[in-house]
Amino acid sequence: MKGLNLAEWAIRHKQIVYFFIIAIITGGLWSYFHLGRSEDPDFTIRQAVVTAAWPGASAQQITQQVTDPLEKKLQDTKGLDYIKSFTHDGKTVIYVNLKDSVPKEEMQTRWHEIRNLVNDEWGSLPSGVMGPYINDRFDDVYGSIYAVTGDGFSYEEKRKYAENIRRRLTGVEDVQKVELLGVQKQEIYVEMDQNKLASFGMRPSDVFAMLQQQGAMMPAGMIHTDSRNVAIRVEGLLDTVESLKELPIHVGERSFHLGDVASVTQMYADPETSLMYFNGKPAVGIAVSMAPGGNNLVLGKNLEKEIEKEKSELPAGLDIEQVADQPSVVNDSIHEFTKSLLEAIVIVMAASFLSLGFWSGIVLALCIPVVVCASFIYMKWQGIDLHIVSLGTLIVSLGLLVDDAIIVIEMMQVKLEEGMDRLAAAQAAYKGCAKPMLAGTLITAAGFIPVGFAAGQTAEYVGAFFWVIASTLLLSWVASIFVSPVLGYRFIRVKAGEKKSAFADRAYRLFYKAIAWCIRFKKTVIIGTAAIFAGTVALIPFVNQEFFPDSVRPEIILDVNLPSGASIKETKEVMAGIADNLYGDNRGSSFSTYVGDSAPRFILLFDPLAPEDSHGQMILVARDSKVRDSLRDDTLAFIAEQYPDARAHARLITTGPPAEYPIMLRLSGKNVEDTAKFAKEAAALVSQYPGMKNVSMDWPEETPVVRLKIDQDKVRKLGGDNYSISRDLYVKLSGYKVAESYQGNQLVPISFRLEGSNAARLADLSSLPVHVGSGRYVPLGEIADISYENETSTIWRRDLHPTITIRGEAGGDKTADSVVNELYDRTLKDFREHLPDGYTLEKGGAIENSEKSVQYLAAPVPIMIFLILMILMFELDKIPLMVIAGITGPLGLIGAILSLFLTRQPMGFVSIVGMLALSGMVVRNSIILLDQIRQHLADGKKPYDAVIESAALRFRPIMLSSVTDVLGFVPLIPSPFWRPLAVSFIGGLLLATAIGLLVVPALYCWYYKVEGPKAS
């Protein structure tokens, strides 16, 4: 490198270098202890949820009158990807998903636009629709969850204690929000005997009117004096059960209290709403979310202190137990990865001492903490937390960051062995290595560009990978220029008068012969390498496909779905039976149950499901990952045996963006009937695939309904109408909300119903008396034809089309992604080709996300290739040399694919990233070799000798750096997330380095027609 020799400058100003070394190490240690901690990196969930309810409407009616107009309006959302909706009897849930290309800085603007669109449509919805409501905080993570339990305590007592705790936890540092779970709403029921009501000549509507008037909050005005304003407050609101009982009722000349003629009781709502249990005990949950930028470990300690205070104040028998403890999980995860990082440092240092010798190894060992600490400073500056990706990336970069230092140290050592003094050796190392090392470093960093600049949720999840590794590589180059020469000048030792040839030992002689053979038979070597490469690429379809593996976390997410239309009471009984079976099983440490609802998002990689009475969810926490699978399998077997009508599915937490089922295929069509028909055919074909299990559709079977065809003429003659009859039936069967009671911070509905009628059986429906006006009651069967039918109770839609998802699980050794590809490309190929126009079958779930992510990952690849070629061109200055170096890039695929194939590791996101980056590292080695050939030619050597001696001279540093790179990856092998990358890197780099050292000379000699001596 021409110009100022920075190595010489550093040696002459080593006190300045020492100062910065101390400053960097000090700043790095401070940064490390002040970095945020989390288990997984944050990524933006670009989804908002719109909900609405229309009591009494069927799924078909609410789809047509509410879901469809809202979806059409929401199609105007800027940056919209797709809309998915779930419509059930009386309610609809619409998921608005934005494109991954929408910057997270614009998300709040998009949510505001969605609110405006929904508000614009609100006035056009039918009267009686409640909502729509918008939840744009769907990505809130409640990492710390507690359960308040206690035998002998009512739900209301537990709620009050939980509410007090909630208020105190809200003030804890780093707490963003605290929510209560499993709270049972109370309701006041005013029940009257139907005959007694008739004897007073009263109609239900008369009672409604009195309760509504008495319970309404109305302003009574304000008196304005000269000095102040005085508000008038009217007492007598219905704020207690006693005040309701004392409510005066006047019928004609008779007066009495409501409590004299009606039963007034306050109880929990019937039927119950979503329920929570912990270890089988009824519970009220307290869910805590962390503020943005907070530290999980600090939050965990603060919460622990506050909860201990609360426990000491609770009455005997009431307990607070921890359900989810994300700070503890983060602490364990950080500890494991920090241990792996230290292991990698020790391994790399040991390899350095063995390969370079003690004194040279000392130099390298001192360079490592400087670069690592500088990386911590960069991470703190950029706001990159410590998590699975950033720590794993540091381990990955650890092997790479020593490459430049090894090259400089090895070159100084060689020059000292050749007789140069220390300063001259450092100057020669800088002159010969600085520029090619910089080019190689930039090329290696460029290999990771697709990760740093790809769009999409997955790329956002692993985005820190590029920034951490690129900064570490550049910092390592700076350290090799300034720190390595100074430390080498101080520590490297060579025995006085000792001069060793670089070709002295046996390894060099063997390598010399191999190079000579490759040059002699260069065409054979080139063709053979191309054939091996082609054969390896042909193996790709036989390598398992899995974009992100399951994590080692002990949680099992168990979803249990009863037949559509099942009551929450039945779901509760089934979940209680499962809990009884788990109680006492020492393989599990705890389990929390959610009936009629889903667990909150306790980690970012978990998607809550829409509430449904027929659905129950259980989060089982196994004692450790070793017994996790057996606990899952035994629980599923128990459910299949004891509850054959229930459909159970257990999944583990993945190490990437989640999917509900491992295998998902989505069928969309024009109308509900045909879509359901084709989906059943597809599901039957999927079920026939070998090893498939638990195949189901998210479109449940039809549910029974009672249809009443009212005789309009007869009803009108009797003084009634459809509305009055519907309301009367609602009063009898469910209870009609007529007013509200204000009790502290609780709003308790007041409902009116007739005594005993809630227990009516279907068989008695025709004889059920209904009010038709003027105090008259007639049997329902006299004014209506009663029929029993089945109807679709749930409708899923995607982009306005009815959509059914076929789900399942793969058995055997094949990964779910591999099975989906085979199902789609082979099993269902003929089925897809014969679908009518307007009907499509698409991949869904994890593989859809993975294919989309691969497309995003591929988008920046042309930029990556251009930058690599540009750097090559500036460094080598000749197009033929650029082509030779570029050709070697794909050679890394040979070892990478073979390693994945032989070890049965899946090809997924991180392994694809590894292969892209591997190409940059292989090209880097080629640059070093080609640059050395150019230097030897400039020194006047013959072309053949220049090639041979350059390969031999660079053999040691290239192999040393590759071996240390490989050893640096070893601590990543135990991690399911990083294992595919580590395996592909280890195999790919070792084989590519060996092949590159032989193929590059052969390519060079073939192009430039360099021939060696015949005797060689």
Where are the regions a protein language model picked out?
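Transmembrane helices with small-residue packing motifs
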Residues: Q15-I16, A23-A57, N119-G128, K380, ...
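Extracytoplasmic/periplasmic membrane-proximal domains and adjacent transmembrane bundles
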Residues: W9, T51, W122, R168-V346, ...
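Signature of alpha-helical transmembrane segments and their immediate interfacial
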Residues: M1-R37, C433, K499-F548, M575, ...
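Solvent-exposed, membrane-proximal periplasmic/extracellular interface segments of envelope transport
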Residues: L4-L6, Q61-R137, N195-A216, L237, ...
